[in-house]
Amino acid sequence: MADLSIQGLCALLHLASPQLPVGGFSYSQGLEAAIEHGLVTDAGTARTWIADALAHGFARCEAPLWLLLRRAWSAGDEGAVHEWNQWFIASRDSREARAETLQMGWSLHSLLRSVPWGGEAFAPRIAQLGALVEGAGLAYPTAFACACAAVDADEDHALLAYGFAWLENQVAAAIKAVPLGQVAGQSLLLALHPLLEQAVCEARRRASEAPPRLDTMLPQWSVLQARHEHQYSRLFRS
């Protein structure tokens, strides 16, 4: 990894913050349905669930796609941005999952448009994000990758920040819905740190292949996300 400046670190901490007003806290990505069906009942089963989603979903599809989007933004390749944005939306195989990424993408675009992120030079990219919002939809990783490119954040550090935000949100959902205590939740998050590093390395390998190797094999995760749409009592929107 390249050296990270203080300014770059602050930008990544800002984007990865749970205080970022994009609504990530309101989604569990199927975890709540897994709890409802008795698959996740304690810290141990929560760790297994999140670790599997990280290794077989995030590392194989979402993270390499994020890298491809980050590289496309840096290269000014609008065609590639559009292609990988559509690819990511298509990879969300339930109504709630698609609604999640589109809502969060819209919210991040609105935020970036309202604050001086990246300075005046960022204005053309804001317009490109707006065109996606008005067109086929803006996926959240597309907007996040654009924000990272605007401040020239190193892609490995930026992907780690993106992944940590995803991981922290999953643990927060487990704390609320299992439920787990705060100490148990932090212990769970700490135990997953090494797996996040492995996921970033796997994503880098997959994104660098020709063609990029993108796949997910999480049928139970997909079924539970679809079942969540009809779950009677729930805290989360996915």
Curated annotation (Swiss-Prot):
Disulfide cross-links: none
Keywords: Chaperone, Cytoplasm, Nickel insertion
InterPro entries given in the database record: UreF (IPR002639), UreF_sf (IPR038277)
Keyword Cytoplasm in annotation: yes
Chief place where the protein resides: cytoplasm
Compartmental location: Cytoplasm
GO cellular component, one term: cytoplasm
Molecular function in Gene Ontology: nickel cation binding
Pfam families linked: UreF (PF01730)
UniProt entry tagged with the keyword Chaperone: yes
Known function: Required for maturation of urease via the functional incorporation of the urease nickel metallocenter.
Subunit structure, as described in the record: UreD, UreF and UreG form a complex that acts as a GTP-hydrolysis-dependent molecular chaperone, activating the urease apoprotein by helping to assemble the nickel containing metallocenter of UreC. The UreE protein probably delivers the nickel.
Family note: Belongs to the UreF family.
Name this protein carries in UniProt: Urease accessory protein UreF
Gene from which this protein is expressed: ureF
